[in-house]
Amino acid sequence: MMNLQEQAKMYYTDQGKNCAVAILLAGSDVYGLGLGAEDAKLLVGFGGGMGCGSTCGALAGSIAVLGKLFSTREDFRVLCGKFVKLFREGLQCDSVDCAKLAAKHKSPDRKCEAVVVKAAELLGKFIAENA
């Protein structure tokens, strides 16, 4: 089985899913969350920073995976905040907005693949450290 980064890249690059959906489906596959195409429709609108360059869809997808895994924990909101900080640091950007992240990381041929793969890497490490 592929790791989280490979799964996310496959969904994003090979299957053409948006950033949020790619992370969600990769997380579902790797962590056995039982989510499918119908569930993924909930995150379609988060791609491209909700279509206006706002909050990064890869971050939104990551938070959704964390929610499925950890939402019953009392410290869930704190965990989310910690992941957002890790995401910012990992992508070396002072913002979580798609527009700013894309300006820094997007490439003409691969679009935001680098952001999606990095988000998946960060998410995998974060889950392992907080499980």
Tell where the protein language model's regions lie, with residue ranges.
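Short, small-residue alpha-helix embedded
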Residues: 58-68
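C-terminal binding/interaction regions
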Residues: 77, 81-131
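Active-site-proximal helix-loop elements at catalytic-domain edges
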Residues: 1-31
